[in-house]
Amino acid sequence: MKATTQLRELLKGDDIIITPGVYDCLTARLAETVGFSAVKLLGNVTCGSLLGLPDLGLIGLNEMANHAKNVAAAVDIPVMVDADTGYSGGPLGIARTIKEFGRAGVAGIGMEDQVTPKKCALIPGGTPVVPIKEQVRKLQAAVEAREDPDFVISARTDAESVNGLDDALNRIKAYEEAGVDMVGVAMSWVRKEGMRQRTLDALQRIRDAVKVPLNCMFMDEAIQVGNVTLDEIKQLGFKMGGSNAVRYTVVKAVTEMLTILKNEGSTKNYSHRLASLKEYEALVRLPEFLEMEMRYSA
């Protein structure tokens, strides 16, 4: 089954699709190995891992599409891609973006309505957005440009951080009418403590605003800081939710290991936390390739 069709089938199911935010083939393989049904290739950490740069619109379409192609080929589960603002200021460029990602073999993309150059929505200070009509034209071009009807197009609005939730709700309604398959609202205030009721109320209003499947943006943050539960998010009818924890885990764990290596000259005192060579070889499917080599060399 095509990755696009797999994702469509998942969206028809009763459960929420939790998509860990991966950044390369290995993290995608790890997610698949432990049983996730789909992953999200994040722009933020891909920009950091490929270029060593922050998420400020510094990665381009070709870099992201080429990287996405490798990640999609490395796993047998659907890969959604964070396509930022679409890497173009107009509908013609957006159409090319959709075609490039479609040819890369990913299951779908998410596009946000920030101005260009964009910045990560988790950066304090708000994220300016383009006018609704401009974003609607982009999304209409995206929907029209897909060559595979199962290719999923998700639209996210960042308007809440600058214009409030009412404008964000108006936007996702307009994006739904433009023909996208899923919508989400980035909520800036989930970083604040004691926001449980406000978070729940906002999630309910988002659910009531549209009929298409909903992506719970920054779900980990909503649970940890907004103090809502995964069950509550499920009960509200959200179909997808992401986690940014992969990148934070890697930064923390690798820093700890490197510090021990630098200070002690070996990783002996960290070895209990290291994967074995056999585990790594299984992750990259070495036994499978060796068996294939044996068959063809016989």
What do the PLM-derived regions correspond to, one by one?
Residues 1-216, 224-241, 289-298:
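Alpha/beta enzyme core
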